């Protein structure tokens, strides 16, 4: 997910995206805790995507 793609979305769409990413992060963390997650790099990717979305939401709220 690119930041330029996220900037084109509205705040409502970004909030929906954030909610989906938080759910995905929860599921990945549960899989990791139970030893079912083979691709542990996904945790890092989702965490960074959450940060991207939150950053853009904050910048749009300030503008």
Swiss-Prot record:
<comment type="similarity">
    <text>Belongs to the universal ribosomal protein uL29 family.</text>
</comment>
<dbReference type="GO" id="GO:0022625">
    <property type="term" value="C:cytosolic large ribosomal subunit"/>
</dbReference>
<dbReference type="GO" id="GO:0006412">
    <property type="term" value="P:translation"/>
</dbReference>
<dbReference type="InterPro" id="IPR001854">
    <property type="entry name" value="Ribosomal_uL29"/>
</dbReference>
<dbReference type="InterPro" id="IPR036049">
    <property type="entry name" value="Ribosomal_uL29_sf"/>
</dbReference>
<keyword id="KW-0687">Ribonucleoprotein</keyword>
<dbReference type="InterPro" id="IPR050063">
    <property type="entry name" value="Ribosomal_protein_uL29"/>
</dbReference>
<keyword id="KW-0689">Ribosomal protein</keyword>
<dbReference type="InterPro" id="IPR018254">
    <property type="entry name" value="Ribosomal_uL29_CS"/>
</dbReference>
<dbReference type="Pfam" id="PF00831">
    <property type="entry name" value="Ribosomal_L29"/>
</dbReference>
<protein>
    <recommendedName>
        <fullName>Large ribosomal subunit protein uL29</fullName>
    </recommendedName>
</protein>
<dbReference type="GO" id="GO:0003735">
    <property type="term" value="F:structural constituent of ribosome"/>
</dbReference>
């Amino acid at each position: 997910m690119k930041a330029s793609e996220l900037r084109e979305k509205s705040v409502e769409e970004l909030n929906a995206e954030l909610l989906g990413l938080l759910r995905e992060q929860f599921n990945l963390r549960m899989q990791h805790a139970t030893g079912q997650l083979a691709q542990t790099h996904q945790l890092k990717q989702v965490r960074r995507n959450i940060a991207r979305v939150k950053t853009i939401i904050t910048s749009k709220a300030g503008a």
